[in-house]
Curated annotation (Swiss-Prot):
GO MF: proton-transporting ATP synthase activity, rotational mechanism
The protein, known as: ATP synthase subunit b, chloroplastic
Membrane-traversing stretches: 27-49
Function as written in the Swiss-Prot or TrEMBL entry: F(1)F(0) ATP synthase produces ATP from ADP in the presence of a proton or sodium gradient. F-type ATPases consist of two structural domains, F(1) containing the extramembraneous catalytic core and F(0) containing the membrane proton channel, linked together by a central stalk and a peripheral stalk. During catalysis, ATP synthesis in the catalytic domain of F(1) is coupled via a rotary mechanism of the central stalk subunits to proton translocation. Component of the F(0) channel, it forms part of the peripheral stalk, linking F(1) to F(0).
Note: In plastids the F-type ATPase is also known as CF(1)CF(0).
Encoding gene per record: atpF
Sequence similarity: Belongs to the ATPase B chain family.
Keyword set, alphabetical order: ATP synthesis, CF(0), Chloroplast, Hydrogen ion transport, Ion transport, Membrane, Plastid, Thylakoid, Transmembrane, Transmembrane helix, Transport
Membrane topology: Single-pass membrane protein
Quaternary state and interactors: F-type ATPases have 2 components, F(1) - the catalytic core - and F(0) - the membrane proton channel. F(1) has five subunits: alpha(3), beta(3), gamma(1), delta(1), epsilon(1). F(0) has four main subunits: a(1), b(1), b'(1) and c(10-14). The alpha and beta chains form an alternating ring which encloses part of the gamma chain. F(1) is attached to F(0) by a central stalk formed by the gamma and epsilon chains, while a peripheral stalk is formed by the delta, b and b' chains.
Naturally occurring in which organism (per UniProt): Panax ginseng
Amino acid sequence: MKNVTDSFVSLGHWPSAGSFGFNTDILATNLINLSVVLGVLIFFGKGVLSDLLDNRKQRILNTIRNSEELREGAIEQLEKARARLRKVEMEADQFRVNGYSEIEREKWNFINSTSKTLDQLENYKNETIHFEQQRAINQVRQRVFQQALQGALGTLSGCLNNELHLRTISANIGILGAMKEITD
């Protein structure tokens, strides 16, 4: 058993300059594997993520266009309301002379209701934009997390097994024993 441990300890050290050897240090090789996996994920996932973001962007832009059309319709209604208001104001001047104040109240009620409608449409547009942005962000986060998790689990299950784990522990114990003998 000691010979196996000694051979593992000697394999765990870097070979001297000019010679060839294998690095069996599991930590160093995992860094390489992880960097390769991350590189592959970034290379291949970039297109999928880009398409997903482009689709989301188009949906958000369509929502913004629809909201702008609603806003333009509301502005058009507001202009009609202003024209009607001018007409009501002229009639109000005529009726004011006669003592009528009912028209004035109707005018202000109409202005307030139109203003509230316009404010509600603006709020609806802003809420829709915010909601679509949050939904797009959450979906992108979820997909990226799932892809990263699947890649990491695939890498881990392909690289680790019990025998390799036990051999690594034995080699590290041997290294620590050798270091203790050197210091004693």
